[in-house]
């Protein structure tokens, strides 16, 4: 605990896949200052995605300064800083100079597909699943880190000499903001690395040996809500959670059976399972989340690789919309998609398929298909993929969700939210506070330093802005969904690969 009597604000840093943001909250969890900066995406080869870690730090630092200036407050009035981040994205840097040895390898990047295939051939898949709760997929940090050590000249030798450090983005930012004094991560981020035992809550020696990772590179793993250190300007760094776990906490889904979907670049559906690490038989991940006080809890997660990025593709590559916000208007102009299905498997398929060799496709094209139908099919694909995951999740947990809480940029799209409720047959609740990912990090930081007293105080701040109720009948719903399943099957195993 720290003395927060004269400090009236919490800063949340929300380091995402395409932008860095800073959001300042007051004691009533109102937003009083924000700033956002986009940064460059690098695609050196097909299926590869990289970021510049120094640009991430620079944009994140700038947004903090800008948000404080916008709010008209000083560092001295800030009780604590919480960080939430794009997960799995992997940074390796020099301990002395603080310079990365390679670009950050982003969660979307598929370059370690062959490393994963070799792990499977060597018979490690079951152990990885049992120990980490994850599937053997290029999505997670461990094989990205192995790729850097294997492919960057001198990296492995330097890592073994203790000269290099590894971190996910939270770790990298805290190391930079603390002036190189603090090398930590939290349980939620560690659980996404493919190197962490989610049952013993330790780095797993056998997995480190399998991947060839020197243990001394790894950060210390700590709870999501505690004071880890201070920035150079003296602000307590007091909360960390991976973006999806942070959103789950920000939505107050802290009890078993509560679930949310975040619609961002990808879509992420998490269900809190309390102290039970539920094993999925449907290709979902078992991961670590935050309990009522930020302590370790478990969750089931389904990840959809391409959600909002599908709309970005319509805008930036096909150029059939000028602004993502316009998609609601165009989709609503037509009564249905005219039989068109868009499967956005640009980087393979995530849960529950886990097919890195699938590729995107448009199905059902006829001469009567207009641009509006394709735009509508793109939005519908986000809802269909969410249903894929939610169906699997409900079967694993043996219970039916009465409602789904939603957040992320795309929830502003009323067409998408209504179609989501229709295709699920479940109410969709959209909160008044849209910044739930940042809010979760702020809550974790505020609880750690005594800024907020506890969960009851936070629950009072959660207001539902609009509820979308299902309007499709069962026959229509299932006919549409059957068409989607048929389309997905046609995209599977498209890329050539070794067996």
Curated annotation (Swiss-Prot):
Sequence positions that bind ATP: 17-19, 265, 308, 312, 409
Any one GO molecular function term: glycerol kinase activity
Entries under PROSITE patterns matching the protein: FGGY_KINASES_1, FGGY_KINASES_2
Residues noted as binding ADP in the record, renumbered to the chain: 17, 21, 265, 308, 409, 413
Binding site for glycerol: 87-88, 139, 243-244
Listed Gene3D superfamilies: 3.30.420.40
GO biological process, one term: glycerol-3-phosphate metabolic process
Regulation: Inhibited by fructose 1,6-bisphosphate (FBP).
UniProt pathway: Polyol metabolism; glycerol degradation via glycerol kinase pathway; sn-glycerol 3-phosphate from glycerol: step 1/1
Keywords: ATP-binding, Glycerol metabolism, Kinase, Nucleotide-binding, Transferase
Class of the enzyme per the UniProt entry, highest EC level: transferase
Reactions accelerated catalytically: glycerol + ATP = sn-glycerol 3-phosphate + ADP + H(+)
Binding site for sn-glycerol 3-phosphate: 17, 87-88, 139, 243
EC number: 2.7.1.30
Gene Ontology CC annotations of this record: cytosol
Family membership: Belongs to the FGGY kinase family.
Function, as annotated: Key enzyme in the regulation of glycerol uptake and metabolism. Catalyzes the phosphorylation of glycerol to yield sn-glycerol 3-phosphate.
PANTHER family found in the cross-reference section: GLYCEROL KINASE, SUGAR KINASE
UniProt name for this protein: Glycerol kinase
Gene (UniProt): glpK
């Amino acid at each position: 605990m720290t003395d927060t009597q004269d400090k009236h604000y919490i800063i949340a840093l929300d380091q995402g896949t395409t932008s860095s943001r800073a959001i300042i909250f007051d004691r009533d969890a109102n937003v009083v200052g924000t700033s956002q900066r986009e940064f460059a995406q690098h695609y050196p080869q097909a299926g590869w995605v990289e970021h510049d870690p120094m640009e991430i730090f620079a944009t994140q630092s700038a947004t903090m300064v800008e948000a404080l200036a916008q709010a008209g407050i000083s560092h001295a009035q800030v009780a604590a800083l919480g960080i939430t981040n794009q997960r799995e994205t992997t940074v390796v840097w020099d301990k002395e100079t603080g310079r990365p040895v390679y670009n950050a390898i982003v969660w979307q990047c598929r370059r370690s597909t062959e490393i994963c295939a070799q792990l499977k051939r060597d018979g490690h898949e079951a152990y990885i699943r049992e120990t980490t709760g994850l599937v053997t997929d290029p999505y997670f940090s461990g094989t990205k880190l192995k790729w850097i050590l294997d492919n960057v000249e001198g990296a492995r030798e330097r890592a073994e000499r203790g000269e290099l450090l590894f971190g996910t983005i939270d770790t990298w930012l805290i190391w930079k903001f603390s002036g190189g004094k603090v090398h930590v991560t939290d349980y939620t981020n560690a659980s996404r690395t493919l190197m962490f035992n989610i049952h013993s809550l330790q780095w797993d020696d056998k997995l480190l040996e399998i991947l060839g990772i020197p243990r001394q590179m790894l950060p210390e793993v700590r709870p999501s809500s505690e004071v880890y250190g201070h920035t150079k300007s003296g602000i307590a760094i007091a909360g960390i959670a991976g973006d999806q776990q942070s959103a789950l906490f920000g939505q107050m889904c802290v009890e078993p059976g509560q679930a949310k979907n975040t619609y961002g670049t990808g879509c992420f559906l998490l269900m809190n399972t309390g102290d039970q690490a539920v094993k999925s038989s449907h290709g979902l991940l078992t991961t670590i989340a935050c309990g009522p006080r930020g302590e370790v809890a478990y969750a089931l997660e389904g990840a959809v690789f391409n959600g909002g990025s599908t709309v970005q593709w319509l805008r930036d590559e096909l150029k059939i919309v000028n602004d993502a916000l316009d998609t609601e208007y165009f989709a609503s102009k037509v009564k249905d998609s005219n039989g068109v299905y868009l499967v956005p498997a640009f980087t393979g398929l995530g849960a529950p398929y886990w097919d890195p060799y699938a590729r995107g496709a448009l199905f059902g094209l006829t001469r009567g298909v207009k641009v509006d139908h394709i735009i509508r099919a793109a939005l519908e694909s986000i809802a269909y993929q969410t249903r894929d995951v939610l169906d699997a999740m409900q079967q694993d947990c043996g219970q039916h969700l009465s409602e789904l809480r939603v957040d992320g940029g795309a929830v502003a799209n009323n067409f998408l939210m209504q179609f989501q409720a229709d295709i699920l047959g479940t109410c969709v609740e959209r909160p008044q506070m849209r910044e739930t990912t940042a809010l979760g990090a702020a809550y974790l930081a505020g609880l750690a330093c005594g800024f907020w007293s506890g969960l009851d105080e936070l629950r009072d701040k959660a207001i539902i802005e609009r509820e979308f109720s299902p309007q499709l009948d069962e026959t229509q719903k299932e006919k549409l969904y059957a068409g989607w399943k048929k389309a997905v099957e046609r995209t599977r195993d498209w890329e050539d690969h070794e067996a």
